[in-house]
Amino acid sequence: MALWQQGQKLYLPPTPVSKVLCSETYVQRKSIFYHAETERLLTIGHPYYPVSIGAKTVPKVSANQYRVFKIQLPDPNQFALPDRTVHNPSKERLVWAVIGVQVSRGQPLGGTVTGHPTFNALLDAENVNRKVTTQTTDDRKQTGLDAKQQQILLLGCTPAEGEYWTTARPCVTDRLENGACPPLELKNKHIEDGDMMEIGFGAANFKEINASKSDLPLDIQNEICLYPDYLKMAEDAAGNSMFFFARKEQVYVRHIWTRGGSEKEAPTTDFYLKNNKGDATLKIPSVHFGSPSGSLVSTDNQIFNRPYWLFRAQGMNNGIAWNNLLFLTVGDNTRGTNLTISVASDGTPLTEYDSSKFNVYHRHMEEYKLAFILELCSVEITAQTVSHLQGLMPSVLENWEIGVQPPTSSILEDTYRYIESPATKCASNVIPAKEDPYAGFKFWNIDLKEKLSLDLDQFPLGRRFLAQQGAGCSTVRKRRISQKTSSKPAKKKKK
């Protein structure tokens, strides 16, 4: 691949740039398929914020959160294969390729309700029924709304990327005064389990730009709302972060309100005429915003509880699970019902209603089940393949224990027996323990090392896959078995 350099006046032949190879050029598929699935995955918590109860904590479990599953697959190079002639361990390495995936969700459909007991909504700017020219020091109100409706399903072998806006460091020459608006910049981060989706108030770091703590619903008050950076992931040269994605977003503006506060960037008299009293100062801010609404939730527009077949990925990685890892990013607030639990405060049954005699609690529950169809593949260890993987994803070669061997040393080495003893010198050239590159991130870890099966017809997704291949559940899948053939004709038995 060759690109023209920007700013050059003489158009010389561009400098060639190394191309990223499609995984299909060096990965051979074996047509051996496995089914893998999880148990029923459940999570329960408070829908708005974590709650401390003694030494324990009720986690925050909101329908507006991402669920990011880090799926560990077994190493196929240490796998008990049905046919030992499938590959040559001295010349090849085995990898997994994703063929199908299904994310199943339980629980009934329900709108996601959020809000704030002291929300900064000064006036109704939609219905003009009275004139207000002043604001008090505190005009906050109890407000509830249904969040923007979102469904997201994104699969890759590295974590998905999210984007958000946050405050930036101003230039040295631009000295900000107290109370001035800070500059903003767009940043990226891995989408982790529990990160908040964008629910109609923008993708931003609200902990940094929301000093009033009243401009947003409670569940995103001190959070970073992320939006998947589809543009960046689509341009990823390796194509590891996004094999494919499915999404559905739905929102409309239900109410239009005005924010309270001192507007330092108020419109000038170029945009309006002053009143007959000669007062040109606007008493009410012109900062309008719309309260989002996700509207109708229906089974007609669900992207879950259905299979997805991966024939061609959008990037150069056609579904290969490098390092035996998959990252499944899910966002779904169409099952956002929150339970209200009321308990008598003194433990005795109530005979008449008295709000001071019972406690109320808030809980949200989620239910998932994941299923995959995996194909066994092999990668031939050639100089070109090793060079390509070294530049693309060096950790793959490290896990395969492939590297440049140092020359044999002619110096006599010393080996101490009790190297950890206080009587022995401190050990040198100690090989550090292998670190998990995702140790500092939060994911829902799923171990499928012992969950793979060749009997596809015993599972719902497996039967659907067989139907795609034109085979029914009654069809016996023949496994390839190496047999020695003889050139001598078979002798007929005498009757």
From Swiss-Prot:
Protein name: Major capsid protein L1
GO molecular function list: structural molecule activity
InterPro entries: Capsid_L1_Papillomavir, Capsid_L1_sf_Papillomavir, dsDNA_vir_gr_I_capsid
Main localization (coarse): virion
Function statement: Forms an icosahedral capsid with a T=7 symmetry and a 50 nm diameter. The capsid is composed of 72 pentamers linked to each other by disulfide bonds and associated with L2 proteins. Binds to heparan sulfate proteoglycans on cell surface of basal layer keratinocytes to provide initial virion attachment. This binding mediates a conformational change in the virus capsid that facilitates efficient infection. The virion enters the host cell via endocytosis. During virus trafficking, L1 protein dissociates from the viral DNA and the genomic DNA is released to the host nucleus.
UniProt entry tagged with the keyword Glycosyltransferase: no
Quaternary structure, from the entry: Self-assembles into homopentamers. The capsid has an icosahedral symmetry and consists of 72 capsomers, with each capsomer being a pentamer of L1. Interacts with the minor capsid protein L2; this interaction is necessary for viral genome encapsidation. Interacts with protein E2; this interaction enhances E2-dependent replication and transcription activation.
Name of the coding gene: L1
GO-annotated biological processes: endocytosis involved in viral entry into host cell; virion attachment to host cell
Gene Ontology CC terms, in alphabetical order: host cell nucleus; T=7 icosahedral viral capsid
Family indicated by similarity: Belongs to the papillomaviridae L1 protein family.
Pfam families (UniProt xref): Late_protein_L1
Alphabetical list of HAMAP family matching this protein: PPV_L1
Keywords: Capsid protein, Disulfide bond, Host nucleus, Host-virus interaction, Late protein, T=7 icosahedral capsid protein, Viral attachment to host cell, Viral penetration into host cytoplasm, Virion, Virus endocytosis by host, Virus entry into host cell
Organism for this UniProt entry: Bovine papillomavirus type 1
Keyword Disulfide bond: yes
Top-rank taxon: Viruses
Source taxonomy: Viruses, Monodnaviria, Shotokuvirae, Cossaviricota, Papovaviricetes
Subcellular location: Virion; Host nucleus
